[in-house]
Structure formats: C-alpha cells, structure tokens
A protein has these predicted regions:
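Active-site/ligand-binding neighborhood in enzyme catalytic cores
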Residues: 126-322, 329, 337, 344
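General small-molecule cofactor/ligand-binding pocket signal
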Residues: 79, 313-315, 487-490
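Mid-domain catalytic core of redox enzymes
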Residues: 224-228, 232, 243, 253-255, ...
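Dinucleotide-binding Rossmann-like beta1-alpha1 core, especially the glycine-rich loop
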Residues: 47-137
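Glycine-rich FAD pyrophosphate-binding loop
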Residues: 20-45
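Conserved Rossmann-like nucleotide-cofactor binding loop
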Residues: 11, 36, 373
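N-terminal Rossmann-like FAD-binding beta1-loop-alpha1 element of flavoenzymes
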Residues: 2-29
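Flavin (FAD/FMN) cofactor-binding core of flavoprotein oxidoreductases
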Residues: 469-503
C-alpha cells in the first residue's frame, strides 16, 4: 500500500510518524513545498534568546500534542507559562482585565464593579444579561461572535473586552466569525442556563468544586487565554486551521487509517509519560495552561523528522501541482518548487522512483495537510470544495523585540496587554515574553512580542519588513510609554495565513 502525504507541517509529519509506525509494511511518502519542514512553526536562536516567529505554545489540555512530545522523548523539556494580570489598552489608557471574568464575561460582582475599563452604563448593561433569554440562532444553529455577545453584554463590553479577546485569536471581523465553528461551548452554556452570565457563573462554580463538567473546563480553559498573553497567532488558531484543513483528507480509507493511528498512539503512551502527566496536574493550573518546550516548538519538528520509521520518505522542495483520480488510484504531479524541474531533496537515502522523468506519483491513499487555498485549486470541478475556494483569509505579522532591562523605561506589569479594535493603531496585542516564558530570555533582558494586523487594515501586506519593524516599535513605545530603542527586532509576516470561519 502506498500513501502520499502533502504538506510537511506538524500535521503532515505527525500523520507520517504514527502511520509509519502503525503500518510498517506500507510505503509512505511526504512532499513539502518549502525548503524546510515545520510549516508556520519557526524557532530561532538569537544569542541566548529562544525566539518563536510563529506560534509560541499550545494548550495543555490538548493532550494529543503532549502525547507526541513524550513519544519523541522530549517530555523533560516541557514547561508551562507563568501567569500574570493581563491588561487592555483602550484609547490612551491601560486597564486590568476585570478579575473573575471568563473570556470577558463577568462571573464575580465586586471585581467587575471595581473595574476601570468599563463605564457604569456599560456595567449595568452587561448585568442585564442575567435576565436575558437565549439568542435566536439561525437555521443552522449559528450566529456571529459579535452579534451574540452584543445581544448579551452590550456594545461597550463587546468593544473593550470581547472583541480584543476573541477576534484577535482568529484575526478577523467579529461580526462575521461563526460562534458555532470557533466557540461552540458558549452556545451550549447559554442554551443550558438561559444567558451567559448565569451560565459562566455556574460553569466556574462547577469547575472549582468538582472539575468534572466539560463545558466548565472548556470555558475556564478558554478564559485562561488572555492571562497567558494571548496573541493573534496562537495554538487556538492553529488548532482550528489544521482541523478545518483535514476536510481535504479525501481518501476515506486513509482517513480511517489516521483515526486508528491516533488511537493507537494514545493507547500505547508510555507509563513514564502517564506518570509525568499526572505529576504535572497539580501545578499546571497554578503555572498556566499553555505548554512550550525549552528548545522551542521547532524542537518537536526536528525530533519527529529524525524519528521517522524507515518506511517513511520525506521530501522538501517538492511542489504538488495537481492530484487526479485515475483507474482507482491517485496520480500526484510533483515538480521541484525552486526551478520547476523534477527532483527534490530527501531525508532518506533512497530516491522515490515516481519522481524520475516527471512521472506522477501513484498512491492508494492521500492525506492532505495544507491550507485550503492550496488544495482547493486541485478540485475545480468538485462542488464540494466551493466553500473552501470562497473562504476569506486574513494576514498578520509578529514582531519580536529585545531590550536591556536596566535601561527599559516602560511599564512591565503582568503578562501583556490586548488592544481594542477602535484604538487608532494596527497593533492588536503585546506579550511580555520574559515574564510569560522566562526560560526564553536572559535575566537582564526584556522581550516584547507584538502582533500586527486588523480587519480592513492592509499594513501587513503593504509594508516591507523593515517598515513593519519600525511601525511596531513606534506604536508599542507610544502604547506602553517608553522611549528606549530595541537591541534587535525580528519580523515574521504571515500573509493570508488564517482562514476565516464565517457564518
């Protein structure tokens, strides 16, 4: 049996790794267009700094990733984020996020009453949700995030808390983003309790007392996002992006094989991994709900490539230009992604014969782990892919900048801040990395991770990396109130990187 995997990011590599181990008699070939594996995961070493130019962590409750880390022998390098107060910047002022809130939804009276971010009329309007009835969903049981929370909590809460918290995760228009596709548990909570204030209060109480309600756990876990320094490109976006991309797993047999492999991996997790996970349960809630590795997320990519079984053949610099179904098999046209000539660099000693003379690769099954914009073009006559072709994509940029702590004259309270969409800046958030992930930064340095890109603002596509760097420094200096210049800046532009899961 021959299996072809298209895409060498974390999803494609993981599929190859587990499938190769589960089916040693199968031949598995993976094609990656870029000259490197890892996709958006990109870790750089800058002197004594560990710099993440893509996602910087994953949610600890997503145990599949933790299982993989342990399977690769990297369990001892796992660390949790340090928690701290998160803030919101709104039109010239920095305010703490109200205590006792879950994703901006108040669950405790006094912290919300004392909050400086929301005006008294805004607080009273949010409190009226206690008497609200459930929102009337559309025929698909869906509604946009914006319309849902504006109905429950009012315009001011939407603008100052909900939008910077939730819209930033997906980099999109909160009045278009589907609640059912992104935060379905909010609908479940509302339907069960009648409104969001009652529901989130009950969910928090249930979680704190028993810890057995999935809705409560999900709600509280999602509420940890801002406390951990949430930004535009996070594990949540990655997770949804990769999950939606899996719809292109159009060979049904390979899809069922992948499901079997995932279960096999979970069932065969080592006793040591289980023990390690149990030992961390007591401290995870205290130290943060995100996970990182001391060597950066790219250490997972390096380890999984090195640990591939011998029946898996990995190739970089290979572009899949078309996929056709011919006589019960899949024909995959592959060309060199650099000079358009057939050939590739391989991590294995044996070349793949199907690449010779531009002959198509032939496979019994195909697994695709690329963005929708890549694979939807291969199925132009298939109406089932129309929704992918029409899917909007948003862009963002990440700027990492380092300062000497002894000369830094800004306010370093908490883990970071979010920026309201109505504030006149293209920035959406800033994480203080030396306080969120202290192991990534020397003790005498300050590192800021700044996120750029709002709906309707084209600066990420229009400006050069040098211009984006200057813009990010200038804007965050103004917001945080400091004047010192950074020792260095690293920029990563992610053009049309985030599919928009709109209603």
């Amino acid at each position: 049996v021959n299996v072809t995997i298209v895409g060498g990011g974390l999803t494609g590599l993981t599929a190859a790794y587990y499938l190769g181990h589960a089916k040693p008699e199968w031949t598995i070939t993976l094609f990656e267009q870029a000259p490197r594996f890892g996709g958006k995961i990109q870790t750089q070493r800058v002197d004594d700094f560990v710099v993440e130019l893509g996602p910087d962590s994953y949610l600890g409750r997503k145990t599949e990733m933790t299982d993989l880390v342990h399977d690769l022998g990297l369990g001892d390098t796992l660390v949790s984020n340090e928690t701290g107060q998160a803030f919101v910047y709104d039109k010239g002022s920095i305010h703490p996020i109200p205590g006792g809130s879950i994703m901006g939804i108040p669950t405790e009276l006094m912290p919300f009453v004392k909050a400086t971010l929301i005006s008294w009329p805004g607080k009273l309007r949010a409190g009226l949700d206690y008497f609200k009835k459930p929102y009337q969903l559309d025929k698909n049981g869906d509604v946009s995030i914006g319309h849902f929370f504006k109905y429950h909590l009012g315009q001011e809460m939407m603008d100052k808390l909900i939008e910077p918290l939730l819209a930033g995760i997906y980099g999109g228009d909160i009045y278009k983003i589907s609640l059912l596709s992104t935060f379905p548990h909010f609908i479940q909570v509302e339907q069960k309790y009648g409104n969001m204030v009652k529901g989130m209060m009950a969910a928090k109480m249930s979680h704190s007392k028993a810890g057995v309600s999935k809705a409560a756990k999900d709600a509280v876990a999602e509420g940890d996002v801002p406390r951990a320094g949430k930004g535009t490109m996070t594990d949540r976006q990655f997770e949804s992006h990769e999950a939606k991309s899996s719809q292109a797993n159009f060979a049904s047999n390979s899809a069922s094989s992948s499901n079997h492999v995932t279960k096999t991996s979970s069932n065969h997790q080592s006793a040591k991994a289980q023990t390690d996970m149990e030992s961390r349960k007591g401290t995870a809630a205290q130290s943060g709900m995100f996970r990182q590795l001391t060597g950066g997320l790219e250490s997972v990519i390096t380890a999984i490539v090195e640990a591939m079984p011998s029946n898996v053949h990995l190739h970089t610099g290979t572009l899949v230009s078309d996929i056709r179904y011919v006589d019960g098999m899949y024909a995959i046209d592959v060309v060199n992604s650099v000079n358009n000539a057939c050939g590739c660099q391989s991590t294995t000693d044996s070349a793949t014969e199907v690449l010779l003379d531009k002959a198509p690769a032939i496979a019994d099954h195909v697994i695709i782990s690329t963005p929708p914009a890549t694979y939807s073009q291969w199925f132009k006559d298939d109406a089932g892919f129309d929704f992918l072709r029409s899917m909007e994509q948003s862009s963002c940029a990440i700027a990492i900048m380092a300062f000497d702590k002894s000369t830094f004259d800004g306010d370093l309270k908490g883990s970071g801040l979010l920026i309201t969409r109505k504030t006149d800046t293209p920035l959406t958030a800033c994480t203080i990395l030396n306080q969120k992930w202290p192991q990534t930064t020397p003790d005498d340095k300050v590192v800021l991770r700044v996120f750029i890109g709002k709906p309707g603002n084209d600066v990420v596509e229009r400006l050069s990396e040098e211009e984006l760097s200057e813009l990010a420094v200038k804007e965050i200096q103004h917001i945080m109130g400091f004047s010192v210049k950074p020792e260095w800046v690293r920029i990563n532009r992610l053009i049309h990187c985030m599919p928009q899961y709109n209603v």
